[in-house]
Amino acid sequence: MSQFQEKVFAACAKKEALFNESLGRYALRSMLAGAYLTMSTAVGIIGADIIATGIPALSRFVFAFIFAIGLVFVLIFDGELATSNMMFLTSGAYYGKIKWSKVCTILLYCTFFNFVGALILAWFFNQSFSFHHLTDKSFLVTAVSTKLGKTDWMNFTEGITANMFVTLAILGYMLLKEESAKIFIALSAIFMFVFLVNEHLIANFASFMLLGFNGVRDAVDNFTLANILR
């Protein structure tokens, strides 16, 4: 048995056991994962806006780097993130360690509570001083406008490539032994997909909800429920 199989089988068993034993605890861990990514998204937005006043070209670099820290939070604090679970659980199902029906149930449950966590933190951040002073020139407005302006094909292909980067981050963190190397591979892989503006479901929960609770949402013409769901 390879090291990958050992790690995946152990992770699947742990996740399934937690889900079976306590839906409440699993929901809380899922909410925290959504919250961690919303935290790093919020800080990244403010950081990008501040750096844009002096060196606009660095805004994307700043946001991508700060956002990546959110995934490190998820990994260190053992949050349940839907996109990382897609790798663990589908691999476990492929090897026959967990039923496909259970995989789908856990993923749907995890995704829903990732959204709840993002929703709650987005509301809280929008009560803060920093988010009360966002303008229609904010990085948040630009980022969401770009995302909602993409074609369905772009969303499909970029969703795949984003998950490839996330998988690399999770695999590196799981297989490497040196802590500094684990953090570097996680940060670098996530930085890359964010810098490319690829589509990540939970990251979109964060950015859309942060904008949705803010008055500058009116600056995004295509910020509609139908377009968001697309």
Predicted regions: what is each one?
Residues 1-230:
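Alpha-helical transmembrane segments and their helix-helix packing motifs
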